[in-house]
C-alpha cells in the first residue's frame, strides 16, 4: 500500500515534490 500522501499509478506509488515526481515500487 502507498502512504496516505502518495498516489498510485499502474501499481507504483509516487509522490509529487513541486514539479518533481519520485517513483517507488
From Swiss-Prot:
Q: Which family does it belong to?
A: Belongs to the snaclec family.
Tell me the tissue specificity: Expressed by the venom gland.
Q: Where is it mostly found?
A: secreted
GO CC aspect terms = extracellular region
Protein name in the entry: Snaclec bothroalternin subunit alpha/beta
SUPFAM superfamilies per record: C-type lectin-like (SSF56436)
Cellular compartment(s):
Secreted
Q: What is the purpose of this protein?
A: Thrombin (F2) inhibitor that inhibits aggregation of rabbit platelets induced by alpha-thrombin.
Where in the chain are disulfide-linked cysteines found?
2-13
User: What binding partners and quaternary form does the record give?
Assistant: Heterodimer of subunits alpha and beta; disulfide-linked.
Amino acid at each position: 500500500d502507498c502512504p496516505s500522501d502518495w498516489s498510485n499509478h499502474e501499481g507504483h506509488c509516487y509522490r509529487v515534490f513541486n514539479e518533481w515526481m519520485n517513483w517507488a515500487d
